[in-house]
Regions:
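Bacterial N-terminal signal peptides that target proteins for export
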Residues: 1-11
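Lipid interaction determinants
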Residues: 12, 20-162
């Protein structure tokens, strides 16, 4: 009788552990993106299919999605000699930095950011939408179309977990 109880207890424990493991693996889209992401590459894809590195070399940066619906993003390109100054408040490299609040579209795997302030002032008080591709520790964030001196482009950020 004790043997039967031991087997029944073991089977119940095994099922409980399996159910807990399955629940832990089934994260929502929002839960999966929360936290810091290191930016490993950035490129802009123009309407004609051309891909450009408008940064002049490798970038460094991070985007963070907080549990409370807040986000920050900063991308810093390589230093440019002509941008150097003695004022530490003036960057000597291309910089894109902004922050604000965000919501998610679970079904569409999209992040909708409401930019509150930015290093490029016309971006303040605008909406930015990223479609997210990939899973796990590596993602690609595809931004909403923008315009620059070369035309309309879609920014793409490749990110990984730290």
């Amino acid at each position: 009788m004790c043997f039967v109880r031991t087997i029944a207890f073991g089977a119940t424990l095994g099922l409980a552990c399996a159910a807990t493991q399955a629940t832990a693996q089934e994260k929502s889209f929002k839960e999966a993106i929360i936290g810091p992401w290191i930016i490993t590459a950035v490129f802009d894809e123009y309407q004609n299919g051309e891909k450009k590195d408008n940064w002049g070399g490798p970038v460094k940066g991070q985007i963070t999605f907080g549990r409370t619906g807040r986000f920050t993003q900063i991308i810093v390109g390589p230093a440019v000699a002509s941008m150097k100054s003695d004022d530490p408040r003036k960057p000597d490299a291309p910089v894109v930095a902004y922050y604000g609040s965000y919501t998610v579209d679970e079904a569409g795997k999209k992040v909708i950011g409401k930019v509150e302030s930015a290093s490029y002032s016309p971006r303040a008080n605008t909406e930015s939408i990223w479609t997210v591709q990939g899973s796990g520790d590596k993602l690609t964030l595809i931004g909403s179309p923008r315009k620059d001196q070369h035309g309309t482009f879609t920014p793409k950020l490749e990110v990984r977990r730290p």
